Amino acid sequence: YAAIPAHPQKQYTRRWCLYHFCGSCYPIREVIPIAIYHCNISIVSRGKGKSAVAAAAYRSGEKITNEWDGMTHDYTRKRGVVHTEILLPPHAPPSFSDRATLWNSVELYEKAGNAQLAREIDAALPIELSREEQIRLVREYCSSQFVSRGMCVDFAIHDTDKGNPHCHIMLTMRPLDERGAWAAKSKKEYDLDENGERIRLPSGRYKTHKIDLT
C-alpha cells in the first residue's frame, strides 16, 4: 500500500492507498486527502444533563424512550441520517442489536446521578469516497479499535445537501465480559518499587493506580 500524501497534489494514479482516520490507517481505493479535518471526542454524562438514549435517538433519527427517567426522545423528523449500524462483540446479548435495548441497558446499569454513560467520536468523512466506502471505513475502524476490546458501538453517518459527510460513533464506557454482562470501567494495580515490591504510603496503605479498560 502507498501512504496518502500529506498535502493535496495535482495528479493521482488509480491505486489502493492508506487513509488515515482517527489515528489509524485503512486501505481505500484512490483516496484524496480530506479538505477539512475534524475529529472530536466527548463524554455523554448524566451529571451534565445528558443521556445516552437521547444521544442515540438524535444520531439515528429515531424515537426512543429512556427507561431511566421516562422521557421520550423523538428525532424521526431529523434529516441527513443516511446510515446507522450497531456493532457488537461476539459475547454480547443478541437483544443489544436493538438500539433502545442497548442504551437503556446502559442507563439502567449506571445508578449514579453523575454517571458517564457513553463516549462519542464525531469525525468528518472524505467526500471523495463513495457512500459504501465511507461506511466500510467507519465499520472497520470501530471493529478493530473498540469491538475487539469488548465494547458495543452504535454509529451513524450524516450528510446533507451541502455535502458535509460525517460520522457519530457512540461507544459504551464499559466493556462486556465473556458472559455478556457489563464489566468494570477500570481496574486497580499496585505501584511497585525497583525490587518489585509494593510501595507503602505513610498512611500504611499501598500505592495504587487505575487502568482504564476501554
Cite the ranges covered by each PLM segment.
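N-terminal nicking endonuclease/strand-transfer module with a His-rich metal-binding environment
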Residues: 12, 19-214
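Charged/polar low-complexity intrinsically disordered segments
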Residues: 4-9
